[in-house]
């Protein structure tokens, strides 16, 4: 397939005029490709200048190597979605009817216990650290949402209960259904405030700024620093002393961590590391700090980082 792609790019795409407008099929962060830009429109001329796959002097074998090198295995929901497309799945109306089931706190608790549901808190990364339902996990709907659900929740039939800002419940359900999660069974009516008003406890995730972490690192105490970005991002550049612990494989690798140790987590900007922290806390890890602003903020401190490397195969 990579060889055929080489031919189609050179024989059908590259001969077109430079002012041809290009729209991406996928956005930055998608597992459907690598080195994808966040821009939503481009020109073929711009792509010829900056896209590694369109360099004129690249040989077939060089193209195949660059395209395939460093590719990680696809998220587990990809093949499951293929089977759903072949055999069919529930219609969106039925999924919405089931999922748009607003529950009071008592009903929500009962449904959680009886179905062994997964509670996903979809609020913002700014809100969640200050108070969320214990044992729920955070995946924010305002950021890369459905792909991370698909990567981190192995069972597409998993019953899901939703915590969402008022008025956004339907959006969450639709976005879950787009990647095959057709079993949301309801949401907490009144959200986190209803839970709080009922007198139930809230959990928190400790956070600190990059500057605060730099001061902590300067005390001489042992620091366990986890970089939860993808391996390609880590290889490009990372904080000295950080261990790569990609969020993509957290379920597989969690046993490698010691729940009695304190861990500091960072990603690119603070979103993925907060997901990781919530998942670790749901599995019994208590001594966790999320570094706000992620690597971008850490790089601006006096702490050492590796020299930047050009990784053409970055995902």
Question: What are these model-predicted stretches?
Answer:
Residues 1-74:
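Metallo-beta-lactamase
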Residues 2, 46-83, 87-89, 97, ...:
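Rhodanese-like catalytic fold shared by cysteine-dependent sulfurtransferases
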Residues 12-14, 107-113, 212-219:
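Short amphipathic alpha-helices and their capping/turn segments at secondary-structure boundaries
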Residues 17-18, 113-116, 133, 156-157:
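Short, well-ordered loop/turn elements at secondary-structure boundaries
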Residues 24-28, 34-35, 80-82, 122-124, ...:
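Short, well-ordered beta-to-alpha junction loops that form the rim of enzyme active sites
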Residues 96-107:
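A contiguous, basic/glycine-rich beta-loop/short-helix subdomain that forms a polymer-engagement track
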Residues 107-123, 138:
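Conserved, hydrophobic alpha-helical core segments of structured domains
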